[in-house]
Amino acid sequence: MAELKVTQIKSTIGTKQNQRNSLRTLGLKGIRQTVVREDNAQNRGLINVVRHLVTVEEV
C-alpha cells in the first residue's frame, strides 16, 4: 500500500482546536517535522483539515 510523507510547514498559532488536534493525530508536533503515514481514507481526511499547514508527498 502507498504511503504519504507529511511535513508541517506552518505554525499552529491562531488555528482552530480541531486543526491542532488533527496535526497531533497525524503525529506532527512542530514546524519542519515529517512523518510517514499510510495512505487511507482516515489519514486523507486528517490531511484535508490541515492542508494549508502541511505539504504531502507520495513515498
From Swiss-Prot:
CDD domains: Ribosomal_L30. It comes from the Bacteria. One of its GO terms (molecular function) is structural constituent of ribosome. The keyword Oxidoreductase does not apply. GO terms for cellular component: cytosolic large ribosomal subunit. GO terms for biological process: translation. The keyword Membrane does not apply. Keywords: Ribonucleoprotein, Ribosomal protein. Signal peptide: none annotated. SUPFAM superfamilies: Ribosomal protein L30p/L7e (SSF55129). Belongs to the universal ribosomal protein uL30 family. This is Large ribosomal subunit protein uL30. It comes from Rhodococcus opacus (strain B4).
